[in-house]
Regions:
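Flexible cytoplasmic inter-helical loops of multi-pass small-molecule transporters
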Residues: 2-4, 196-204
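Transmembrane alpha-helix termini and helix-breaking/packing motifs in multi-pass membrane transporters
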Residues: 44, 48, 159-176
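Symmetry-related core transmembrane helices of the 12-TM Major Facilitator Superfamily/SLC fold
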Residues: 176-193
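Helix-to-loop junctions at the C-terminal end of transmembrane segments
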Residues: 70-83, 168
Length: 204
């Protein structure tokens, strides 16, 4: 009985759809480490650079607004072109590269622009990524597939701020915190490229 259950679990993880979901989940874990780690310190960072509390709130709110507005157009473009990987990769590149660049911001204006750009990047890639995931999840169970992906995603969301907190504790530098996030950003993009190479047409 135990052997049969083990073989059943093993067979599940041999499925290409499950492998794709796991790869995208690992990528999301690394991506969340990057931008959630960043978001945990952007407020104090803007304040240190000279931004007022009102400005910090405005930048955060406008960034979210811009990201959601972009999703509308990105979703429409995804439906028209079916260029799922191109749109997803473009969004992640913008989304993830903006984070470590915050280490080089010499003024709150530059930092604010990068924060908004990061949110826009997320808005670009969300619809196309969700479409690809939905195709994979439809083959293994929508709830289970999305649950697996979201579990990995949320692990990254927890680890990111914790890692940044550790960097600040030992180095006391916001710039060092943002610079350190370059590592998970590069790893996330690398996993995304591997996923594209292995599954060029995940919607088929």
């Amino acid at each position: 009985m135990v052997k049969k259950k083990f073989e059943g679990i093993r067979d599940i993880f041999k499925d290409d759809a499950v492998k794709f979901i796991i790869l995208m989940g690992v990528m999301s874990l690394l991506a969340d480490m990057t931008y959630e780690g960043s978001r945990s310190i952007t407020g104090p960072y803007l304040a240190i650079l000279g931004a007022s509390a009102v400005t910090v709130g405005f930048v955060a709110g406008f960034g979210e607004l811009a990201g959601y507005v972009v999703r509308f157009f990105s979703g429409h473009l995804t439906d028209r072109t079916r260029s799922y990987w191109t749109i997803t990769l473009s969004g992640y590149l913008i989304n993830l590269i903006a984070v470590p660049l915050l280490a080089l911001a010499g003024s709150w204006e530059v930092a604010a622009a990068l924060i908004i750009i990061e949110r826009v990047g997320k808005g670009i890639r969300v619809p196309s990524r969700v479409v690809m995931l939905s195709h994979a999840c439809s083959q293994v169970g929508q709830g289970w597939g999305f649950g697996l992906h979201e579990a990995l995603d949320q692990i990254g969301a927890i680890l990111g701020p914790l890692i940044v907190a550790a960097v600040l504790f030992f180095h006391g530098s916001y710039q060092m915190g943002f610079a350190f996030l370059l590592l998970p950003a590069i790893l996330a993009i690398s996993v995304l490229m591997i996923s594209r190479s292995l599954y060029p047409n995940p919607h088929d």
